[in-house]
Amino acid sequence: MNNAVKEQLAELGIEGYLNQHQHKSLLRFLTCGSVDDGKSTLIGRLLHDSKQIYEDQLAAVHNDSQRVGTTGSRPDLALLVDGLQAEREQGITIDVAYRYFSTQKRKFIIADTPGHEQYTRNMATGASTCDLAVILIDARKGVLDQTRRHSFISNLLGLKHFIVAVNKMDLVDYSQDRFEQIRAEYLEFSKHLQGETEIQIIPLSALEGDNVVEKSRLMDWYQGPSLLELLEYVDIDRDKSSGAFRFPVQYVNRPNLDFRGFAGTIASGVVKVGDKIKALPSGKTSTVTRIVTFDGDLPQAQAGLAVTLTLADEIDISRGDLIVLESAQVDSTNHLLADVVWMTEQPLQVGRDYDIKIAGKKTVGQVKAVRHQYDINNLSTYHAESLPLNGIGLCEWTFTQTVALDKYLDCADTGGFIIIDRLTNVTVGAGLVRDSLQNITGQTESFSAFELELNALVRKHFPHWQAIDLSRLGKA
């Protein structure tokens, strides 16, 4: 048991502690930035100074610091996060490491992401589930290419809150001039980011603990809050609940003849008993009669809650369908524009079929064209025929089925999809819907009778090839 938990138990008792803990809000955030900017050390300092480290963990860090540490005689707090042997030996982060901690005000899940360019795909994976990005900048080096890359990816993935932590201020003698110079440089770069992003910039030293949990006495020129205070008070609940109601159906719950409910997690917005809803893509309408949870029925539920909805009418709804309010206008299309983050050595190929998973629905899609690829360093675009490993570009997609979807910036769950290689079943990329385009219909007219017959023969005798049913292309 760590010291923070001991103190809260002594103050509140077991029941009081559990009740308070259950009702705390949860913030998921990631640390990102260039190599050796101090991401893992910052997380280690945050855990250490907020009394979230167990005694055996601290003893192990002291022992490992003598062998593979990079901080001399002091404990290397980065070792609290870097768990892989290769990470400890090289002093770098490779995989995304997740850590959990809580304070009296909030619960946190931290994703420590790698800074090397070759591991950009790992960083994008970590950012995809987060609400906030802590972007580290080395005070000696300033804004680097990887700083811009990670800022752009975080922005592309819809993160609306950035905390830019200018780290290693102790190595520039806590210079206010140096901090202001970096601050101005980053704010100038941020003008090119899309959407509305709240940016807070803070000077700190992860190694010394300045402005991490407690305010620094060596930077009295900085009058803002510490990093932990910013994390505790940022308002992310409003972002999720203010959107339109979206409920991707994950499972049809029918334990007996008298109950039929639709289970899933609310992606955005709020639903109440009595609300008029419709199911997509069918368009059938009904009324919500119950909102069922493990702890009992609720009068209303908001984004993030896992619930089962029961309806007044027996309408056909299955896994992958989307439940929205009856008045909602939702695009249903098989033709769209999406930003793609490519995550494998083999480049994205125009015209090749990939499995697509979006909000519980599975279909097949292919890229008709790569509109452009992004230059991460200056956020400009240039012509490209395909996307390489870690490449990011805007692509035109067609799906074999009509899919109800949103723009990614409006709702990540219904606007984001993963791209899967049909032969290896490996996730090769992530797509973020930019806009829907006019449906493509009548695709079967381009196939001859011989092609359709051959396709049917291949699917019958070689099902492991996962060939598309050409006769169904263009059908919903």
Swiss-Prot record:
- For the region G3, what residue ranges are annotated? 112-115
Q: Where is this region: G1?
A: 33-40
Provide the transmembrane region boundaries.
none
State which Enzyme Commission number(s) the record gives: 2.7.7.4
Which residues are involved in binding GTP? 33-40, 112-116, 167-170
Query: InterPro entries, from UniProt?
Result: CysN_GTP-bd (IPR041757), CysN_II (IPR044138), CysN_NoDQ_III (IPR044139), EFTu-like_2 (IPR004161), G_TR_CS (IPR031157), GTP-eEF1A_C (IPR054696), P-loop_NTPase (IPR027417), Small_GTP-bd (IPR005225)
Q: Which GO terms describe its molecular function?
A: ATP binding; GTP binding; GTPase activity; guanosine tetraphosphate binding; sulfate adenylyltransferase (ATP) activity
Catalytic activities: sulfate + ATP + H(+) = adenosine 5'-phosphosulfate + diphosphate
> Where is the stretch described as G2?
91-95
Q: Its GO biological process terms?
A: hydrogen sulfide biosynthetic process; sulfate assimilation; sulfur compound metabolic process
SUPFAM superfamilies, A to Z? EF-Tu/eEF-1alpha/eIF2-gamma C-terminal domain, P-loop containing nucleoside triphosphate hydrolases, Translation proteins
Under which main EC class is this enzyme filed? transferase
What pathway is this protein a component of?
Answer: Sulfur metabolism; hydrogen sulfide biosynthesis; sulfite from sulfate: step 1/3
UniProt-annotated stretches for the region G5: 205-207
Q: Which UniProt keywords apply?
A: ATP-binding, GTP-binding, Nucleotide-binding, Nucleotidyltransferase, Transferase
Answer yes or no on keyword GTP-binding: yes
tr-type G domain ranges (all copies): 24-238
Q: Where is this region: G4?
A: 167-170
Q: Please explain the role this protein plays, according to its UniProt record.
A: With CysD forms the ATP sulfurylase (ATPS) that catalyzes the adenylation of sulfate producing adenosine 5'-phosphosulfate (APS) and diphosphate, the first enzymatic step in sulfur assimilation pathway. APS synthesis involves the formation of a high-energy phosphoric-sulfuric acid anhydride bond driven by GTP hydrolysis by CysN coupled to ATP hydrolysis by CysD.
Quaternary structure per UniProt? Answer: Heterodimer composed of CysD, the smaller subunit, and CysN.
What family does this belong to? Belongs to the TRAFAC class translation factor GTPase superfamily. Classic translation factor GTPase family. CysN/NodQ subfamily.
According to UniProt, the name of this protein is Sulfate adenylyltransferase subunit 1
The root-end lineage is: Bacteria, Pseudomonadati, Pseudomonadota, Gammaproteobacteria, Vibrionales
The gene coding this protein: cysN
